[in-house]
Amino acid sequence: MGAPRTCLIFITIQLVSLAYAQEVSKRVPQGFLGMRGKKYFDEEGIEQFYKRKPQFFVGVKGKKSLQDILEAPEEYYKRAPMGFMGMRGKKDLGDSQSTELFPKRDGSLIGKIDYSSKEENADPDFPILNELLLQYLSQLDAPRNTYMQSSESMEPEQSNDLDKRAANFNQFYGVRGKKSINNKRPYDLTFRGKFIGVRGKKDLKNSNAHEIKFLVDQNGPLPKRKAQMGFFGMRGKKWTDEPSLEMDMPN
């Protein structure tokens, strides 16, 4: 009798706690600023969560639709910033010679300068400016110094084939230019110093065995070279006509 009554009381307590828990509304903690996950909203309740752009909005976050720009290009027209001094790109002018599209200021020379040559007829609208330009061009064509011209005419003409003279000895550090070889042989060897040796190889092709033996003999003009201590190889190969030449050579 006691056990069923205890079970009934326990079940009753559980049902009461579940019913009370459903009636209590849960509130978010204080200071809650974000949400983990996403909420599902119907299309009717989206407007209340619309985020407006912040105040003092300067730029655009994202890209603009090309269709909106084509439909209303006046709304998306960008004007140059204050103090704009330059231009990115070039303007296409139909007539490059015309100066009507350029803004003219007070004292500006745009459209007033005659760029034609002296052979062409000057513009009668600007006689003073044309005269000044012709005078300036004549000064450029004329010699700058008549004295230099007269002194140069008195000097005899010199060709570029002459040798160049070096500077002072205490300031000379090398050869400036090239020396003429007209008065010298193309392979003049007189400038060399003491003869030391010949860097090359001996010609054994046209020599016989007696000549080679005389040259490499110990008492001959060219004593035979002995191998170095620890010599294990040879740099290159020697070529001889007779294969038994080494047998005749003294050790």
Curated annotation (Swiss-Prot):
Name of the featured protein: Tachykinins
GO BP terms in the entry: neuropeptide signaling pathway
Positions of the propeptide segment: 22-25, 39-50, 65-163, 180-183, 203-223, 239-251
Gene Ontology cellular component list: extracellular region
Lysine amide carried by residues: K61
Source species, domain of life: Eukaryota
Cleaved signal peptide residues: 1-21
Tissue and organ expression note: Tachykinin-related peptide 1: Expressed in antennal lobe (AL) and gnathal ganglion (GNG) (at protein level). Expression in AL detected in all animals, in GNG in most animals (at protein level). Not expressed in corpora cardiaca (CC) and corpora allata (CA) (at protein level). Tachykinin-related peptide 2: Expressed in antennal lobe (AL) corpora cardiaca (CC) and corpora allata (CA) with expression detected in few animals (at protein level). Not expressed in gnathal ganglion (GNG) (at protein level).
Predominant location: secreted
The family this protein is said to belong to: Belongs to the tachykinin family.
